[in-house]
Amino acid sequence: QEGNPKKRLFRLQEDNGIINRMGFNNAGLEAAIVQLKKNKKQLIIGGNIGKNTETPSEGYTADYLECFEALHPYVDYFVLNVSCPNVGSHAKLNDKDYLEELIKAVQSLNATFEKSKPILLKIAPDLNDTQLDEIIELVAMTKLEGVIASNTSISREDLKTDDTTLESIG
């Protein structure tokens, strides 16, 4: 998929920060597999998978499962990225019931392979305490191998960069 329109990366000099609006720009699953086949197993490779920008909510799980199955032979672990603020509507991805369904679906698929792979969950930094508690409970219940905290924040609080500049870049 194309990702978000360019410019997608903005430096905030006064804040020693960056605004990232990449949007999962990439050449696609097949192109990734071509590159991964070149790996001579000298490195540990992780598969960071997420929904496509255009995928409607009823297709989210299918996106994850398709990527998981196709990449399984080529990666050492997986990251279920449910935290990218740059791929359109992602509120459902942080819903406890949906997350449980997604994790269990991926774990079921993982169990069909001769060698299962570790699965981690990448979460957003802007979750509220209730959401964090639910995710911690879910990670413990499903016995995921870990959590990656965190992805890009959508918060623009406490920045030195002036509001006019922030509005002009997003």
Model-predicted segments: where are they?
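Conserved alpha/beta-domain cores
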Residues: 23-170
